[in-house]
Each structure stands twice: as C-alpha cells, then as structure tokens.
Amino acid sequence: MPRPVNALIVDDEPHVRVLIRVLLKQLGIETVWEAPDGAAALDQANAHKPDVILLDINLPQVGGLEVLAKLKAAHPKIPVIIVSSQSTMKTVIQTRELGAEAYVLKHAPKSEVLQMLSDAFDNIAEGDAADAGGPVSETPAPPAA
C-alpha cells in the first residue's frame, strides 16, 4: 500500500482533532473521519475501514489502550499511530506491544509532529511492501542453497 489516503482521528479534544486534520491535509490525506471517544472509534473503523488510525491514549469512558487492543483485534491490518501527550516509556512500550505502529507526541512543535507523521506513514508503506513481498532494502537476498 502506498502512503495512506484516508484516516480516522480519535481524540476527545476537538481542537486537537482540527490540528491533526490540518497536518494530515498537508501530507495529502483529504478524507478524514473523526471520533471523540473509543466507542465512536470502533464504530467509525467498522464503517469506513480507514487506511490509518490516529489514536489518543487519554479517552473518556474506554481508555486508549483498550481501544487499541479492540481495534487491532477487529482490524489487524489497519495501522494505528498513537498521538498522545503521554510520553512515559511504559506507555510507549504498552502501545507497541498492543500493535501500534508508531508513537507521536502531540504537544511537540507542529513541524516535528508533521515530520513524525510523515515518517510513520513512510514506515507503514515500507512495512506493507515487505508484507507483500516487495523490496524493503537495497540488500539482495542470499542465493538459495
């Protein structure tokens, strides 16, 4: 899969969703769905099957870690990028263990968030190429024995 063309933003803060939407537009993502909580995130993911999900950890009612686990169980091939203000190593490790592809700090300067998202999208595209048997690096495979 090339870089994502649509996305689902899951964050309970409307101004954060607007900011992420603007950054995604700068990266060429025009179709964006939004969810203010975990239940809505699951509904939106089921309805739209987005190319990528951007998920906050601090959500009302159902926490982001539980939402991440449910999203990955229901849609294991949809990449999830955590976009959170939490920056503890424990949280980062937990999200990676649950299947998140990347972790972006939302309170970093906008230019850094934009670069982190761009890098994450590139990594997702490269990972999909590897899953499809496409090239991941310039190193040739060793000859078959």
Which sequence ranges carry the predicted segments?
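Two-component/phosphorelay signaling modules centered on CheY-like receiver
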Residues: 14-33
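Acidic catalytic/metal-coordinating carboxylates
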Residues: 37-40, 63-66
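Active-site beta3 strand of CheY-like receiver
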Residues: 48-54, 59
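The feature encodes the CheY-like receiver
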Residues: 60, 88
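C-terminal output helix
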Residues: 90, 108-117
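CheY-like receiver
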Residues: 122-145
